[in-house]
Amino acid sequence: MSEQKCEITHENEVIKICNYACQLLRYPKLNIEIMHRLKPVTKGRGYVLGYTNLKKNLVVLDVYTARLRKPKKISAILNVLAHEITHHQRPPYRQWHRGRWIIRQHYPRFYKQVNKNIVKIKKDKILKQYFA
């Protein structure tokens, strides 16, 4: 019988780690997907590190660097994941500001929650090895 090698790719490893982090942050039903870019990001343009869909419970993360398409460090991916999970914990709301309605997506309470999530991830005995 031939032995099959079970290689763990960077994407599979990231999905497993992110699913564990979601359980740690009490959002086990979030679906994690990997963003696949068709071409590298050009110089001087903004680019997306990840995005979330609140209705579908979906988080999409970019696990490769923008230009050279090399695998990112797990700690950087976990920081983006903490930010995206916070969008589910502190959803955006509408606010009347200077005579018009605005949608507050990123606000001080939001960023406090992001920092709390990152601290929880860093305190975990399994995930703290990626921040060393």
Q: Which functions belong to the PLM regions below?
A:
Residues 2-13, 104:
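A short, highly charged nucleic-acid-interacting micro-segment common to nuclease
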Residues 99-132:
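Post-HExxH zinc-binding segment in Zn-dependent metallohydrolases
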Residues 96:
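Basic nucleic-acid-binding interfaces
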Residues 32, 59-61, 81-82:
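Hydrophobic beta-strand residues in large extracellular and virion-surface proteins
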